[in-house]
A protein has these predicted regions:
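DNA-contacting interfaces and partner/effector-binding or oligomerization modules
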Residues: 114-164
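N-terminal low-complexity or simple alpha-helical regulatory segments
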Residues: 1-129
Length: 164
């Protein structure tokens, strides 16, 4: 039996805020999608990642998954992470240690997440993948969230204006 990828509801809340700003009636849409209407009040609840991503893609209308993912990624904050993840990031002694903390703790936020860091010349390549939702129209939403997380972590060390 194939395992269902799960993600903490805290990471869904940014998408819900964007959709609400666009005028989407969230509660009814959540109910129709088989997702709990109490998602925003229960950030530690685990949700089906494919169902969540399908909901985002279906609810976004003309905006499209690409824009929704970007907008939700902009709303992501350190406070959305589990306390032990926050602590590991805030106490990391170096940029590489920050990336290692990200790799280690990411599975607690998203059970299907795959992350790795590979040396590439004098640089490092960070890989974030979402096995289990490759066929979803909303994969790009998860990719934006992952990109925002990595950029935010690098900016802790490289400065707020660093861009990939």
């Amino acid at each position: 039996m194939r395992r269902v990828p799960l993600v903490r509801a805290a990471h869904f809340n940014g998408y819900l805020a964007v959709l609400r700003d666009l005028g989407v009636p969230i509660w009814g849409a959540l109910r129709r999608a088989g997702l709990p209407a109490t998602t925003e009040e229960t950030p530690d609840l685990y949700l089906s990642l494919p169902r969540m991503m399908d909901f985002v893609a279906a609810s976004g209308g003309a905006r499209g998954a690409m824009e929704l993912g970007f907008l939700a990624g902009q709303r992501a904050t350190l406070e959305g992470l589990r306390p032990e993840f926050q602590c590991a990031i805030l106490n990391a002694p170096s940029g590489f240690a920050l990336l290692q903390a990200f790799l280690h703790h990411r599975k607690g936020e998203d059970t299907a997440a795959f992350s790795a860091v590979y040396p590439e010349g004098e640089s490092l390549r960070v890989v974030c993948d979402q096995p289990g939702i490759e066929d979803s129209d909303a994969l790009v939403c998860a990719e934006w969230m992952n990109l925002q997380a990595v950029v935010s972590i690098v900016r802790i060390v490289a400065g707020a204006t660093w861009t990939p």
